[in-house]
């Protein structure tokens, strides 16, 4: 049963009950009856035909919305995407720094500064009235609606590691010192919604840093050179605030050189409700790019920016937004995912990223190993800091991780060995597997195994060495041999930690930090490094080394090594459309320990896949035997540095989702973007796998990336309907209802409209088209061609899609928008009927039907309404944001619609015109209010915390005055008169609504705030139109 029919079945008895008296039947015609209300109307334009197409699209749209909501809420994340954070505890204490008052910052009444101390571990924060500071200053910046207490987890871990002599001994830092964690209390400000709030925080924190450094200057017994800089740790929008700080006039030069951000949206603003936020992003990014482009600037030589994101579990902020690729080069920072970080290996949600046990241990070590108490800067040089960050935050398989590896620089790191050091060795030929196992050690009679690296073959293009072991520290030597001496480098710093994959592990985090099961170790070296050496020496492990491994069952210890000159990379050129139609069959033999499948055409973050794996039929018997390890997969992309680990994959269905090429996110188009799957397979085992599209996960992730479309798409459709309504109104003097007009559009132009929604994505992805769109962009804040010298490019238009295959999303969103608008419209219609019914029940008598209309119709704006409007504008000018006045206008428009519905008219056609006009305008204002409400939330929050300073932004009375006066006109039942279509007045009205439609579709998602201004301009025209006619 269609929605319209369902509403009719519910409401018809009420209408019949009211109409039973007879005398009011001519008065109570509603929009539900408009198909029968005016024969003349039907004969003129036939717009009110039964909209079966509209019903179909409405039902499909509502079903799509429900399905998407159910999938988003109910579908769990599985396997590598499942949350595995462990619980933590700490004993926090906070000392409020009251000395940082109005003498140092004008924002002291609004914000506060605290010093964190871990109870029973740290030094007491106060000695009488004086702060006790003996460490290195770190400033924690909370995010949107964040608390200063969120610093406690990382600060606690830093204190526990440093003040425990055993754990402090494991730090690779001779000049380590305890950390003094300062944290800012912003009273849970909504930073993401309001640019002025972000500026306030940045200004306050610059003053706070200046004050913090002065505290150390006044500390007489500080044991080291006085600090001249502060380490920054920012969560969410706090990371953006930290970047803004360096652009302000009150920034102390050199006071910030190390920034670590957690789930911070560097690449793009997560919301576009406020123009100030977008301008702040633009100005800050341009400042950073300019500074970093100068090789001799402080930024280039000192600033490090490391961004960490929780990946797929961050449903508050799309993980794609955490990329810093367009801001800093790899010499100054990078982006990593928590699924990539060794000993963490789990996705983390937006809030948990500040307290997750596994991650906080790594972050604490990163901070403690990056500092240098002997220097005033209190941090190591830039290249050393990034080397530490790469070691701790990347998997180690990335080429970027090898930048500072000792193996990469043999001339500087080779050590001389005596000729007889490796005297007891056996030689292993290339392509033969070295297989040390706990139960077969006796068959290996030599202490070392030598693997010669070929140098005289015609091509070593595919030369690679792979080692995988359960040992904690395998001994591997990369050696060069000359006539004079033997020189080698131990591969200690190149041994990588990978998750343990066995029958008793399900998730990568099962062998992460603090777990009973030890992870595996691996070495993966390519030709570029191997060609610098003559041979490898691998030490034979002892039985004791195997047996001492925690979580190791009998006979499970192993060490596998293999040198091959055969490519272990299989390139698959299958496209998403081919996977959709046929799937992709994969075959992996057991000839190599690590085999890589590179999907050259799979790079779109919007698509998720499902991978089903099984043992090849020819060797299924292996499944019942004890293998050295269970096959596992490292899923990865080149940049950003995201890796995921899928364990124990036999007979499993794996979810494959990546953060790669994403909507609206800048990327370097010269870098490879292929999805990579590295299979680690025991010798002799062959696997079969099939890849298909995972539609449920794809749809689940759509909502996270396109939440802003919930405002822009409905506004575009409503504006399109209004343009048609005014067209028919000017043509026939009949203003059709929203439902009938949308139904007419779908019936007459639905195929063209949805084809346009599909075709728009590949069209706006064209660079020539983007240049034209940028020239036509009235906002001008989103330049697609960011850094041409680095091939950095972004698609800010429409849905930001770069692949034609996902262009169908436009059609899906179009259908969902029709369903949403139909649902809202029917709710309004039902409320209208209910109001009429209640009015008839409560009213005792009805008089002067026509006279009442005539009196109101000729009524002037009135002094009372004029004074109320002027008073509201004065409030906007002096105190409240104009968004608040907009919502007040929305409430007045709702009241107007109710009053129009209750009118008793002899001329039913006039009432329908007035009702349809006001109802459609109400729909428009309702969805625009979704854009304005976040600013109101910020304003009310400031009122709640009794912040006395006025709301310094959004006091432009011109941004809301036309809306206020138009709604005031509507409240006295005025509406624009119909004019001939061939006049400029009629054309301008239609052109304005068409432009709003196009803008909302093409520019709307990334410029939501501008939609309000366009609606305001249209209201100004309608107000002028009503006045002159």
Curated annotation (Swiss-Prot):
Chief location of this protein within or outside the cell: endoplasmic reticulum
EC number: 3.1.-.-
Post-translational modification: Glycosylated.
Membrane topology annotation: Multi-pass membrane protein
Keyword Lipid metabolism: no
Subcellular localization(s) per the UniProt record: Endoplasmic reticulum membrane
Gene Ontology annotations of biological process type: endoplasmic reticulum to Golgi vesicle-mediated transport; ERAD pathway; GPI anchor biosynthetic process; GPI anchor metabolic process; protein retention in ER lumen; protein transport; protein-lipid complex remodeling; vesicle organization
Family membership noted in the UniProt record: Belongs to the GPI inositol-deacylase family.
GO CC annotations on file: endoplasmic reticulum; endoplasmic reticulum membrane
Purpose of the protein: Involved in inositol deacylation of GPI-anchored proteins which plays important roles in the quality control and ER-associated degradation of GPI-anchored proteins. Required for the transport of misfolded protein to the Golgi, although dipensable for the transport of many normal proteins.
InterPro entries: AB_hydrolase_fold (IPR029058), PGAP1-ab_dom-like (IPR012908), PGAP1/BST1 (IPR039529), PGAP1_TMD (IPR056824)
Listed GO MF terms: phosphatidylinositol deacylase activity
Classification lineage: Eukaryota, Fungi, Dikarya, Ascomycota, Saccharomycotina
Name of this chain's protein: GPI inositol-deacylase
Enzyme class: hydrolase
Positions annotated as glycosylated: 19, 295, 302, 447, 456, 485, 565, 651, 668, 694, 918
Keyword Endoplasmic reticulum: yes
UniProt entry keywords in alphabetical sequence: Endoplasmic reticulum, Glycoprotein, Hydrolase, Membrane, Protein transport, Transmembrane, Transmembrane helix, Transport
A Pfam family it matches: PGAP1
Parts of the chain that traverse the membrane: 57-77, 708-728, 749-769, 804-824, 872-892, 920-940, 957-977, 985-1005, 1008-1028
Catalytic residues in the record: 236
């Amino acid at each position: 049963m269609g929605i319209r029919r369902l509403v009719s079945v519910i409401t018809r008895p009420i209408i019949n009950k009211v109409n039973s008296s007879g005398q009011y039947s001519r008065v109570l015609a509603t929009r539900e009856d408009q198909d029968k209300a005016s024969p003349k109307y039907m004969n003129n334009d036939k717009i009110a035909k039964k909209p079966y197409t509209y019903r179909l699209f409405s039902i499909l749209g509502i079903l799509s919305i429900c399905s998407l909501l159910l999938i988003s809420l109910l579908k769990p994340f599985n396997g590598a995407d499942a949350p595995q954070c462990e619980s933590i505890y700490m004993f926090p204490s906070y000392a409020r720094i009251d000395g940082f008052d109005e003498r140092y910052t004008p924002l002291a009444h609004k914000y506060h500064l605290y010093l964190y101390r871990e109870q029973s571990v740290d030094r007491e924060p106060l000695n009488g009235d004086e702060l006790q500071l003996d460490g290195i200053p770190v400033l924690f910046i909370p995010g949107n609606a964040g608390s200063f207490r969120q610093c406690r987890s990382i600060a606690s871990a830093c204190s526990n590691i440093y003040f425990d002599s055993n754990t402090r001994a494991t730090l690779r830092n001779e000049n380590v010192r305890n950390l003094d964690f300062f944290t800012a209390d912003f009273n849970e400000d909504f930073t993401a919604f309001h640019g002025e709030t972000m500026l306030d925080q940045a200004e306050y924190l610059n003053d706070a840093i200046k004050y913090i450094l002065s505290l150390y200057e006044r500390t007489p017994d500080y044991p080291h050179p006085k600090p001249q800089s502060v380490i920054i740790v920012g969560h969410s929008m706090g990371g953006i605030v930290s970047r803004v700080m360096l652009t302000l006039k009150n920034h102390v030069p050199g006071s910030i050189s190390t920034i670590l951000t957690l789930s911070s949206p560097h690449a793009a603003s997560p919301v576009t409700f406020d123009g100030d936020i977008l301008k702040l992003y633009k100005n800050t990014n341009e400042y950073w790019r300019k500074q970093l482009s100068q090789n001799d600037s402080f930024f280039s030589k000192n600033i490090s920016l490391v961004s960490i994101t929780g990946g797929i579990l961050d449903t508050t902020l799309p993980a794609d937004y955490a990329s810093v690729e367009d801001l800093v080069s790899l010499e100054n920072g990078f982006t990593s995912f928590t699924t990539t970080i060794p000993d963490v290996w789990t996705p983390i949600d937006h809030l948990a990223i500040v307290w997750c046990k596994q991650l906080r241990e790594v972050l604490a070590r990163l901070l403690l190993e990056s500092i240098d108490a002997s220097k005033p800067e209190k941090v190591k040089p830039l290249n050393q800091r990034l080397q530490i960050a790469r070691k701790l935050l990347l998997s180690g398989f990335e080429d970027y991780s090898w930048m500072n590896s000792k193996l990469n620089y043999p001339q500087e790191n080779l050590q001389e060995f005596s000729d007889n050091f490796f005297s007891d060795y056996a030689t292993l030929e290339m392509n033969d597997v070295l297989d040390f196992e706990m139960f077969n050690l006796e068959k290996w009679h030599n202490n070392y195994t030598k693997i010669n690296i070929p140098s005289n073959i015609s091509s070593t293009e595919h030369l690679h060495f792979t080692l995988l072991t359960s040992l904690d520290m395998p001994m591997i030597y990369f050696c060069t041999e000359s006539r004079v001496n033997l020189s080698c480098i131990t591969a200690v710093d190149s041994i990588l930690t990978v998750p343990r994959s066995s029958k008793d592990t399900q998730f990568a985090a099962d062998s992460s930090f603090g777990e009973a099961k030890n992870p595996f170790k691996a070495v993966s070296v390519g030709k570029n490094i191997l060609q610098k050496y003559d041979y490898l020496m691998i030490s034979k492990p002892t039985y004791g080394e195997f047996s001492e491994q925690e979580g190791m069952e009998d006979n499970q210890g192993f060490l596998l090594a293999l040198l091959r000159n055969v490519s272990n990379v299989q390139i698959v050129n299958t496209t998403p459309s081919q996977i959709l139609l046929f799937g992709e069959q994969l075959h992996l033999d057991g000839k190599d320990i690590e085999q890589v499948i590179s999907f050259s055409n799979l790079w779109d973050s919007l698509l998720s896949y499902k991978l089903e794996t099984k043992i090849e039929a020819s060797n299924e018997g292996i499944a019942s035997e004890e293998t050295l390890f269970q096959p596992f997969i490292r899923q990865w992309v080149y940049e950003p540095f995201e890796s995921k680990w899928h364990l124990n994959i036999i007979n499993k269905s794996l979810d494959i989702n990546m953060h790669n090429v994403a909507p609206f996110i800048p990327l370097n188009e010269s870098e490879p973007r292929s999805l990579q799957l590295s299979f680690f397979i025991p010798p002799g085992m062959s696997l079969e796998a099939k890849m298909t599209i995972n539609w449920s996960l794809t749809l689940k992730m759509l909502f996270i990336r396109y939440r802003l479309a919930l405002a822009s798409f409905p506004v575009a459709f409503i504006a399109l309907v209004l343009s048609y309504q005014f067209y028919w109104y000017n043509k026939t003097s009949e203003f059709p209802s929203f439902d009938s007009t949308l139904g007419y559009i779908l019936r007459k132009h639905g195929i063209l409209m949805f084809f346009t929604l599909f075709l728009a994505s590949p069209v706006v992805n064209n660079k020539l088209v983007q240049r034209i769109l940028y020239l036509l962009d009235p906002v001008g804040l989103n330049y697609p061609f960011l850094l041409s010298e680095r091939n950095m490019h972004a698609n800010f238009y429409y849905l930001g899609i770069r692949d034609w295959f996902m262009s169908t999303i436009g059609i899906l969103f179009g259908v969902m928008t029709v369903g949403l608008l139909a649902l809202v419209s029917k709710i309004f219609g039902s409320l209208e009927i209910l109001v009429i019914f209640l009015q008839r029940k409560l009213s005792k008598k009805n008089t002067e039907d026509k006279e009442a209309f005539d009196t109101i119709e000729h009524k002037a704006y009135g002094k009372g309404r004029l004074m109320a409007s002027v008073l509201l504008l004065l409030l906007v000018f002096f105190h409240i944001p104009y968004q608040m006045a907009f919502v007040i206008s929305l409430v007045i428009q709702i009241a107007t619609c109710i009053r129009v519905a209750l009118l008793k008219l002899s001329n039913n056609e006039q009432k329908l015109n007035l009702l349809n006009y006001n109802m459609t305008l109400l729909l428009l204002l309702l969805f625009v209010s979704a854009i304005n409400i976040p600013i109101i939330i910020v304003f009310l929050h400031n009122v709640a915390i009794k912040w006395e300073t006025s709301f310094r932004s959004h006091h432009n009375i011109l941004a809301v005055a036309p809306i206020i006066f138009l709604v005031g006109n509507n409240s006295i039942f005025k509406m624009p008169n119909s004019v001939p279509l061939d006049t400029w007045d009629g054309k301008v009205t239609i052109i304005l609504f068409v432009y709003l439609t196009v803008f909302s579709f093409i520019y709307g998602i990334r410029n939501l705030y501008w939609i309000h201004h366009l609606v305001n301009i249209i209201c100004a025209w309608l107000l002028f139109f009503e006045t002159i006619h």
